[in-house]
Structures are given as structure tokens and as C-alpha cells.
A protein has these predicted regions:
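Nucleotide and nucleotide-moiety/phosphate-recognizing core
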Residues: 1-84, 95, 99-110, 117-129, ...
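Phosphate- and other anionic-substrate recognition elements at nucleic-acid/protein interfaces
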Residues: 88
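Glycine-rich phosphate-binding loop at the start of an alpha helix
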Residues: 91
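Intrinsically disordered, low-complexity regions enriched in acidic/Ser/Thr/Pro/Gln residues
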Residues: 131-134
Length: 169
């Protein structure tokens, strides 16, 4: 999720600035007269709901205007899934957000990063290294295409109905 937001921010020549009271770094830019804000929570993923709650309260944001973007190890690499509401699906970051917002009703985009490889000789997985570690050139190529697709779809939100965007993703 962070890589996608950094790519989008870079595209619009915007930098992320630390916003301590929002427990996040924020990038702000304008597309077709509409202001967009991207936030990178500075919390641990399991506490990302603290940052989202602070952002919603500070900016008085309607939940239908929020798009939470997460990496999902349970989706194949490059798969995109959009939902307007739903459970956390076992994702601890989404679980934290649902708890702090006290609702399941917010937009979320899951980007598949594939399952982590098992640790040699065991049935255990090194999830943290997989999610936070370096990606191969092949994975980067796949994710770059996914990021372009998601960014193009998000940019069209003012011009198209949300349902059309969902179908395109």
C-alpha cells in the first residue's frame, strides 16, 4: 500500500510531510479541482486504526470518501480486490481500523502480494520479512502494473461512477 501511495504522490510532485497529531505522514495535491490527501500511518500496522480515526476526526471526513489501501498476503501477487464494506478478512490493520471507526462501512483496496515462502524445513512462514522485505524485479514489474491500474482508476473517481471503477479494478 505504501509503495502505491508514494508512486501516486510522486506523480503529482507532492511530498509526504509528518503530521504528528494525525499519527501519519501526509501528501496533498489537486486533480481537476479536487483536493486529494494521501496518508501513510506512522503506527504499527496493528494500530493503524489510531491514525485513521485521528484523520477522520481532524478533517471531518465522510467514510465514503476514504480508500484504505492494504497489501494482502492472502491474495495472489498482482490481484486487486475492492470492497465498499466487509470484515477485516484476518488483516490486522483492517481489524484495527474497523475497531476504531466502529464500522465495516468504508472502501478498501487490497493488493495481492502473494503468500510468504515457508521457512526451510518447517511449516512456518516469515510473514514480516515477506511484507516488509525487498521485492524481486519480477514482483516489482507486476506491482508497477497494478499500481498504474489502481492509480488510473482512483484518478477517474470524479469522472465516473464508483461502480464502474470497481468493475475496472
Amino acid at each position: 500500500g505504501f509503495l502505491l501511495l508514494k508512486n501516486l504522490s510522486k506523480k503529482y510532485n507532492s511530498n509526504f510531510l509528518l503530521k504528528d497529531k494525525l499519527k501519519s505522514s501526509c501528501s496533498e495535491f489537486i486533480i481537476n479541482g479536487s483536493t486529494y490527501r494521501l496518508f501513510l500511518p506512522n503506527t504499527f500496522m496493528n494500530n493503524s486504526g489510531d491514525a485513521v480515526r485521528a484523520i477522520v476526526d481532524w478533517y471531518k471526513i465522510n467514510l465514503d470518501q476514504i480508500f484504505i489501501i492494504v497489501d494482502d498476503k492472502d491474495l495472489p501477487l498482482g490481484k486487486i480486490r475492492f470492497r465498499k464494506k466487509g470484515s477485516s478478512g484476518g488483516h490486522n490493520g483492517l481489524k484495527s481500523i474497523i475497531e476504531k471507526l466502529q464500522t465495516h462501512n468504508f472502501n478498501r483496496i487490497r493488493i495481492g502480494i502473494g503468500s510468504p515462502p515457508s521457512i526451510k524445513g518447517t511449516n512456518k512462514f516469515n510473514t514480516i520479512s515477506h511484507v516488509l522485505g525487498n521485492i524481486s524485479l519480477e514482483e516489482k514489474s507486476i506491482l508497477d502494473k497494478v499500481y498504474r491500474r489502481v492509480i488510473e482508476s482512483l484518478e477517474q473517481l470524479n469522472n465516473k461512477k464508483e461502480e464502474i471503477i470497481i468493475n475496472e479494478l
